[in-house]
């Protein structure tokens, strides 16, 4: 007759479970690793969504808005009613200033077919009739153009460096 086994797991069973957990953790780490292209596309889409929202808000509220990008962040502006001064938009979470990923830059590229300086402010009119404009997002060997057409549809396309 054999002695009864003590309850619990054998060493082999414990090692098999540890091996399975290690393999799963390795697969998860590879899957969650930050892909530079995905980061750039996410930043560009986030900016494109804010541009479409700003163009619609300019029409809804009958106000002239503007957008600028200084390389590290973008910001939306509202033209003061009494002058040509631009005031930072502070009453809207979507249009609040946003920083972009550390290894990326965002600058204006063109407005109405003309190249722009890096400190340019692009207007978004209350009529909805805006000139085509574009911004360029560079980083990690990736260059994306965020462009708007006259109907305020914003697209993100890969550009040749």
Question: How should each PLM-predicted stretch be described?
Answer:
Residues 1-3, 12, 16, 23-49, ...:
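N-terminal helix-rich module
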């Amino acid at each position: 007759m054999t002695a009864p086994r003590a309850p619990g797991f054998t060493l082999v069973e414990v090692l098999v479970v540890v091996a399975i957990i290690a393999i799963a953790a390795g697969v998860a780490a590879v899957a969650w690793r930050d892909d530079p292209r995905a980061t750039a596309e996410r930043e560009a889409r986030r900016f494109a969504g804010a541009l479409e929202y700003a163009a619609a808000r300019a029409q809804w509220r009958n106000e002239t808005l503007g957008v600028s990008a200084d390389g590290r962040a973008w910001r939306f502006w509202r033209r003061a009613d009494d002058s040509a001064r631009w005031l930072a938009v502070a009453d809207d979470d979507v249009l609040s200033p946003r920083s972009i990923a550390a290894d990326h830059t965002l600058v204006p590229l063109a407005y109405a077919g003309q190249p722009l300086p890096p400190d340019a402010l692009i207007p978004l009119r209350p009529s909805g009739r805006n000139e085509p404009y574009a911004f360029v997002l560079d980083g990690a060997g990736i260059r994306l153009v965020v462009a708007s057409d006259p109907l305020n549809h914003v697209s993100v396309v890969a550009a040749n460096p």
